[in-house]
């Protein structure tokens, strides 16, 4: 399916598919262990960094991780607020605000629909970092389409990865040299 994506439309800016996948959240437990499908060569593996551009404590890492983006870090300071029902809610101002859907969620913005709670909540993980990279890739492909440019998946991956700061240029951390470039 990925090889055939974008090949039927001759005007597509990407002649094939591009897979961007979260690297995983076991780095603090297992260290440099390859997680699949993120570790496959054609895939862009996304690690997570905290608010200070350091690898998040949980992010999987290693030479197979291609890029890092903001993923949140709950240990980077906590804040409280009062929920609509009077409860004190603790959340990290260093996590990523995301949409949530679950029955017992403590949402940033409470609401009900069909008996379930929905709204926004603060979360962390490489799955919070991955949409940042996917969004930048989508913007890049939209720009390419507007300008009549065409790329193979390998060419676009190389372009995307060459347009970010190297993580070693930004800090010297505990995972120095083990996490891909920083999406800025």
Mark where each language-model region is.
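Extracytoplasmic/secreted proteins, especially bacterial periplasmic and envelope-associated proteins
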Residues: 1, 41, 132-135, 155, ...
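Active-site environment of divalent metal-dependent phosphoester hydrolases
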Residues: 26-31, 53
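Loop/turn elements at helix/coil->beta-strand transitions in domains of secreted/extracellular proteins
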Residues: 5-9, 13-19, 41-45, 65, ...
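Extracellular S/T/G-rich loop segment that most often corresponds to the catalytic His/Ser-adjacent loop
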Residues: 35-138, 142
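Alpha-helix termini
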Residues: 1-15, 72-83, 144-149
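C-terminal subdomain of the subtilisin-like protease fold in secreted/lumenal serine endopeptidases
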Residues: 15-17, 119-120, 142-184
